[in-house]
C-alpha cells in the first residue's frame, strides 16, 4: 500500500465484538485489509422494516486499497451477521 491515491478506508458495523473480531481476522488473513480497528459500543439508530431501531454495535475501520475493495465487499457480505451489511468506502487524503 505505497501509493496514497490508492489507499481507502472502508467502514462497516457488526452486531457483536465476536463477529467484528472474526471479520477483522478474516480480512487481514485474506490480505484484503492491512489493518482493522474495532470500536466497541457504537450506538446506531436506523429504520429497518418500518421500525426505528436503536442498537449497540461494533464499528470496523478497514485500511485497504481500491484494488482490494471488491474482495473486501465480498468477504463482509459473506461473513457479516447483518442481513444487509453496510460498507462505506472513503478516500484517504493523507496518512
Model-derived features: positions:
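Positively charged, small/polar-rich N-terminal and surface patches that mediate targeting and assembly
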Residues: 1-95
Amino acid at each position: 500500500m505505497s501509493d496514497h491515491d490508492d489507499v481507502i478506508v472502508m467502514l462497516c458495523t457488526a452486531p457483536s465484538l465476536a463477529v467484528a473480531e472474526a471479520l477483522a481476522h478474516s480480512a487481514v488473513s485474506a490480505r484484503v485489509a492491512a489493518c482493522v480497528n474495532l470500536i466497541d459500543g457504537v450506538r446506531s439508530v436506523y429504520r429497518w422494516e418500518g421500525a426505528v431501531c436503536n442498537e449497540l454495535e461494533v464499528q470496523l475501520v478497514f485500511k485497504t486499497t481500491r484494488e482490494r475493495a471488491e474482495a473486501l465487499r465480498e468477504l463482509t457480505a459473506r461473513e457479516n451477521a447483518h442481513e444487509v451489511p453496510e460498507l462505506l468506502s472513503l478516500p484517504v487524503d493523507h496518512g
